[in-house]
Structures are given as structure tokens and as C-alpha cells.
């Protein structure tokens, strides 16, 4: 299993972004476990990071106006253009018929990544005989 979403393809990642922007229930469910590092492009990483930060602060998904203001603050013109292009591409998937499937798959992927990280963290704890710590880390990951 790959540590990134590249295995699912380019358009799949764009559908995740559109879900983060338009499906509050999905954003609430996945915001704690989805990481920008799972995405291929720097532009997608920037979008996911920005959506998560906005959600953490305001408890709602960002509006297009809010995103535009954040995009305008990007210092790199290349990244700014890529973010705008990727956002446009993501919006083309707003009405995709497989968004529920994408939700299920990305949630499963993120949960598995979270569990994988917890297991790796548990190895060090096992060497220290910290069994309560291991149980706690695994419980949190589940």
C-alpha cells in the first residue's frame, strides 16, 4: 500500500478536494486524519492545508471568496497559478456520480495510514515495555 493517494489517480485527488469544499459532513469526519502529504502536487497540498486550517479555525468549509483571498497571498506566482488551475479542475468534479465511493475510499485510506503510523510508533513503546502507551496510541488510531 502506497503512503500517498497517487495510487488512486489524479482525478480522484481532485474529487477529494471538491468533497472537502462542498461536503461539510465529510470534512468534519476526515479533517483530523487527512494530511496534505498524501497528495501528489504542491498545489493540492496547499489546497488541503488551507481548507483544513480554515475549518479548524471557523468550523465550516472555506468559501470561494475566502480561498481567493488566501490564494492571492501566495508569494510564488507558479504555485498560485497551479493552485487556481487545480481548483478549477476540482470544480469540474462537483457533480461526479462516484463521490460517495471516493468518500469511502479516502476515509479507508486515511484510517489505514493513521493505524500504520500508530503501529510504527508502538514499536518504540514496545522496546520500553510501555504497554499502556501502545494501547492508547492504537485506540486513538482506531
Predicted regions mapped to residue ranges:
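Interdomain "pre-motor" coupling segment immediately N-terminal to P-loop NTPase/helicase cores
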Residues: 91-142
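Noncatalytic partner-interaction/assembly domains of nucleic-acid and motor enzyme complexes
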Residues: 1-109
Amino acid at each position: 500500500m502506497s503512503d500517498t493517494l497517487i495510487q488512486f489517480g489524479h482525478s480522484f485527488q481532485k474529487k477529494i478536494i471538491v468533497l472537502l469544499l462542498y461536503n461539510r459532513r465529510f470534512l468534519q469526519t476526515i479533517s483530523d486524519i487527512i494530511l496534505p502529504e498524501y497528495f501528489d502536487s504542491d498545489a493540492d497540498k496547499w489546497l488541503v492545508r488551507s481548507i483544513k486550517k480554515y475549518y479548524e479555525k471557523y468550523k465550516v468549509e472555506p468559501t470561494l471568496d475566502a480561498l481567493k483571498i488566501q490564494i492571492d497571498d501566495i508569494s510564488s506566482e507558479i504555485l498560485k497559478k497551479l493552485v487556481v488551475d487545480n481548483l478549477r479542475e476540482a470544480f469540474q468534479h462537483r457533480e461526479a456520480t462516484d463521490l460517495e465511493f471516493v468518500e469511502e475510499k479516502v476515509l479507508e485510506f486515511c484510517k489505514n495510514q493513521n493505524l500504520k503510523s500508530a503501529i510504527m510508533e508502538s514499536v518504540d513503546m514496545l522496546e520500553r515495555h510501555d504497554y499502556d502507551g501502545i494501547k492508547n496510541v492504537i485506540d486513538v488510531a482506531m
